[in-house]
C-alpha cells in the first residue's frame, strides 16, 4: 500500500510539473550507489533508493526502508543531499515526520519520499546524508544507471532470461560459475570489451557489446544473452515463475555443500571480530548440538567452506560478519558476494533461487514477547491467544509479501509458510515454561503435537524443529511422568536421559527404574 501511495505521489508530482510550466522532470529509475555505509550493521535500517526525480522546484528521493517490525527509526531535519560540494536541505518527507521516532509496521517495510531543495538537472552524482553525525545514515555516490552502466569495473550482471546473477567484473579478476577467473587477455574498443579469462585449468571467452537501454549483450563461452546491471542490494525478483514446491530430499544420505564467498570492503572492526568465516547448523539426528564449519579468510576477505550435510539444512552464515540465515542443499555449490560498501548480498549458483529470494524477502518474524512473560504472570490460555494473533499477523505479512512479487517461487512460498508454522509451534512450547503457575494443559500440548506431525521432511530444513521436538517430549514427560511440587513440577528433562542411561549401564543395571 505504501509503495502504491509513493507511485501515486510520483504521478501527481509529474502531472503538476508538466501542467505548471511544461518543463520536463528528469527521472532516475533504480539508481545505483557506490556506498551504503550502514549496510553491514544488521540492527540498523537497510535503505534502498529506488527512484529520484529532478523537478524545477524540488528533488524527490524515493526510498524503501527495511527494519525489524515495531522498532523505530528517525531522520533528522538536517538531512541533506550533497552534489558538487553544495548542500541541498530536506524540506519534508511523505511517510514519516523528520526529527521524530517512526515505528515500523508489522511488515518491517516502509516506502517514503523525501523532498529536497532542487538539485541542478545536470547533476551526475550525489550523496544522501542524514546530517553530519558519525552514525547517521549515509548513502554515497548515487548515480543514474544510464551513466553507471558504462563503467564495467566493478559491476555485477544478471541474465535477463534466467534472472540469475551470472558474472561479475572487477579490475583484477572476474567471478563466474562460482569461481575466480584471471584476465589472460583484456581488450577494450570504446564501450565494447573482449576478454579471455582463465581459472588455471580452462579458458573462457567473453565478448561484451556496448550498453543499450540499460543492458548489454554478452557472449560467454559462445553463449549469447542479454544482461542487466544489478543495481539493488539483493537480486531483483526472477522474471519467470518456478513451480518447484520443495527442497532437495536426500532421504538423510550424507553429502556436501560447498560455499565460496567474498566479504568485500570489510571494515577493520569486522576483521577484528575474527579472520575466519563459519557456517553453522544444528545436528538434528546425533548430538542435538551446533555444528560449525570454518574457513580462513584470505587478505581480500575470500573463503571456501565444505559443509557436510545429511539433508537440505537451515544454516546460519557467520554471526560475526554477515548474519545470513538461509538453507543449503547437499551437492550444490554456492557463491556469496557480501559487499560492505555497496550493500550487495547476492548468491551465485546453478540452484540458488530460494537463497536469493530469502535475502530479498526475509520471512516475517513472529513477535513472541509480551508483558508479564518473564515474570510468569500470564495464564496459558492468554498466552495462546497472544501467540496465535502474532502468528496470524506474520502470516498476513508473508501473504502480502508474496502478492507483491508475482513470480516468487513456489518453493519460497511453501518453505516460508512451513517455517512460520514451525516457529509458531516452537514459540508456544517455549512460552509454556513461563506461564502462570506453570499450568500448561494437555489440550495445548496436543495442539502443538498436531502441528509437529504436519511439518514436512526433511526436518533439517527448519532449525526450530530441533528445539520443538525436545520441548514437545519435555511437555509429554511433564504430563505423564512428573510429580507436582507446589506450583512447579519435578521431572527429568530429556537431555539428561542419555547420560543417566550410560551411568546405569556401567553399573550393570538394565533400566533406570
PLM feature spans:
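Extended low-complexity, serine/threonine- and proline-enriched intrinsically disordered segments
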Residues: 76-88, 272-283, 512
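A non-transmembrane, solvent-exposed segment enriched in polar/low-complexity residues
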Residues: 143-151, 184-411
